[in-house]
């Protein structure tokens, strides 16, 4: 099965490690040709979905790629709003699956390779089965494979990143409270983390880089807030997290 990767940024480069024989197309880096992608059975779309000025997710590059890709299956790795994949299937009449990426931005992120023990795919069952077929060439049978409709999986990705943003914000607030009470935060943190329900990830506090930042968490919490507003759902908790993170980011400037 021939695979192609559209977009050779952080996610695209890690996808190349996962599927080393893949053809690459990235017009900004002047890599490859569209025609090479179009002879592939599966095309992975790994392009940016940056935050627009109004806080929405910019899906224009993803849609542009879907428009011209002629591969039998398109797998969207970029984070997109809930319902986007289904809209693209309806509009372009193509086989499209959403597969969230979990690569993270740190050098030693635990999901930077195919050793992760789960994969998730969202889309029509026949399209999802084709995506799984591609991965079965590189994974072992111990890997759990979750399948659902695209909207469920899109929502799960936003839940993940929003939860991590919430956790970072919570830990930063506990850090400030500990300092205010004359408590050693790091000692308290280790005692807290002894409870296996908590989980150690995203519990460091960097005194010179407070709050959450990067390419994913800020844009994704903003996007899901806007999506909720469109559905007339209040987001008091998420609003407070964004406000607190703004406060923390201003601390970084002092």
Stretch-by-stretch model annotation:
Residues 33-73:
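Rossmann-like NAD(P)-binding element
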Residues 3, 21-25, 74, 94-96, ...:
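Hydrophobic anchor at the start of a short beta-strand
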Residues 151-154, 166-254:
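Interdomain hinge/lid region at the active-site interface
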Residues 1-42:
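NAD(P)+-binding Rossmann beta1-loop-alpha1 motif at the extreme N-terminus of oxidoreductases
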Residues 17-21, 67, 90, 226:
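Short, well-ordered alpha-helices that flank and scaffold nucleotide-derived cofactor binding pockets
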Residues 47, 79-157, 224:
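Rossmann-fold dinucleotide-binding core
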Residues 19, 39-40, 71-72, 93, ...:
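Short, well-ordered alpha-helix to beta-strand connector turns
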């Amino acid at each position: 099965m021939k695979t192609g990767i559209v977009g050779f940024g952080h996610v695209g480069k890690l996808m190349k490690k996962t599927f080393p024989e893949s053809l690459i197309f990235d017009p900004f880096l002047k890599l490859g040709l569209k025609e090479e992608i179009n002879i592939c059975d599966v095309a992975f779309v790994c392009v940016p979905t940056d935050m627009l000025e109004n806080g929405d997710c910019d899906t224009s590059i993803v849609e542009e790629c879907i428009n011209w890709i002629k591969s039998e299956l398109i797998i969207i790795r970029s984070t997109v709003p809930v319902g986007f994949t289904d809209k693209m299937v309806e509009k372009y009449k193509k086989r499209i699956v959403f597969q969230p990426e979990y690569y993270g931005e740190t050098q030693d992120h635990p999901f930077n390779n195919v050793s992760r023990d789960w994969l998730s795919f969202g889309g029509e069952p026949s399209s999802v089965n084709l995506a799984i077929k591609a991965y079965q060439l590189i994974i072992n049978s111990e890997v759990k494979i979750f399948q659902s409709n695209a909207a469920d999986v899109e929502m799960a990705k936003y839940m993940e990143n929003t939860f991590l943003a919430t956790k970072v914000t919570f830990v930063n607030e506990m850090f400030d409270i500990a300092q205010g009470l004359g408590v050693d935060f790091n000692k308290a943190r280790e005692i807290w983390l002894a409870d296996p329900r908590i989980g150690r990830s995203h519990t460091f506090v960097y005194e010179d880089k407070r709050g959450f930042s990067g390419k994913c968490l800020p844009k994704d919490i903003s996007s899901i807030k806007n999506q909720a507003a469109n559905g007339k759902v209040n987001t008091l908790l998420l609003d407070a997290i964004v406000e607190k993170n703004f406060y923390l980011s201003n601390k970084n400037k002092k």
